[in-house]
């Protein structure tokens, strides 16, 4: 086996590297080329429309494509640019806008990895005769029986496992993540040593197609009627003010709600059907149960074979939060997670990612998107009563 756990010498192994034009994927290409692998760099043109293409740090914009091309020239490897803009719009941007309109808070990076990078690009890599597709993600994979399993990376500050939970077993077996055992400073030092022009380049932003971070601008551009005004309502039923569209709000938000109140109020619910923003005290945010959809289970046995009383593991509901104790249940076609410690600011559309434990080298067991969450009994009763009140 070679360094990528593939049979044969590096010189007889073709690897496609997904090159975004950033330092991470550039170093992956450089390391593999230095080992003697036949490296083919592929850059995806995902978004080249309006102001976003001029945004500093936006992924796969014009400058990034030029940077990837220069790195490939420096390394002496083949490089191709593929126009995936239409696929990206249909698979990522349009669903992103639709989710906000329905009151959810989506994670477009998961959708991009799930559909474009690890589905379409992986198929392209196979068509090019590659033995593996390598990326610059900070996550580890290693052999686990007849397959490979995902693990959190050495650099906890760069851990991208939250955004990769939807990677299927078939994809994991074909993918390689050479940076999983490195820190970001090490990667930059290698880029400097190799003389790569991107050695000091800033990291790309998560949402590449949102100019200046104003996602509402993108949504209203794609869906002109999305910003429907409505009431800002207290969870107890009082109308406190008006808003210019639920797409401007997210669960757990406190600042910029647009009302004056004698107590701290948070967005606790987005009622898309009635165009209402529901606010309440912080305790109304506490969530204990998460009902999941589109679950991608990466355990060693089928999800249907979970014990009747569930499986204890750890769950992460935000990319910036550490995993916390939880119990996974699956019964009668439904999958849900019981959080042992309450979480606040849990929004539908976000991900709940599952881990073996809370250590830095924990195994990733997959996860799912949050369909809905259940609060404390008092908050659930108030929300249920509010839904029966006409707007």
Swiss-Prot record:
Ribosomal protein in keyword set: no
UniProt xrefs under InterPro entries: MnmA-like (IPR004506), MnmA-like_C (IPR046885), MnmA-like_central (IPR046884), MnmA-like_central_sf (IPR023382), Rossmann-like_a/b/a_fold (IPR014729)
Bridged cysteine pairs (disulfide): 112-208
A Pfam family of this chain: tRNA_Me_trans_M
Residue ranges, annotated region (Interaction with tRNA): 158-160
Biological process, per Gene Ontology: tRNA wobble position uridine thiolation
Active-site residues, record numbering mapped to chain: 112 (nucleophile), 208 (cysteine persulfide intermediate)
Gene Ontology CC annotations of this record: cytoplasm
Coiled coil residues, start to end: none
Keyword entries, A-Z: ATP-binding, Cytoplasm, Disulfide bond, Nucleotide-binding, RNA-binding, Transferase, tRNA processing, tRNA-binding
Interaction with tRNA, annotated site positions: 137, 350
Main subcellular localisation: cytoplasm
EC identifiers of the protein: 2.8.1.13
Binding positions (ATP): 18-25, 44, 136
Catalytic activity: S-sulfanyl-L-cysteinyl-[protein] + uridine(34) in tRNA + AH2 + ATP = 2-thiouridine(34) in tRNA + L-cysteinyl-[protein] + A + AMP + diphosphate + H(+)
GO MF terms, alphabetically ordered: ATP binding; tRNA binding; tRNA-uridine 2-sulfurtransferase activity
Localisation per UniProt entry: Cytoplasm
Function description: Catalyzes the 2-thiolation of uridine at the wobble position (U34) of tRNA, leading to the formation of s(2)U34.
Family listed: Belongs to the MnmA/TRMU family.
The name this protein goes by in its record: tRNA-specific 2-thiouridylase MnmA
Protein species of origin: Chelativorans sp. (strain BNC1)
Gene designation per UniProt: mnmA
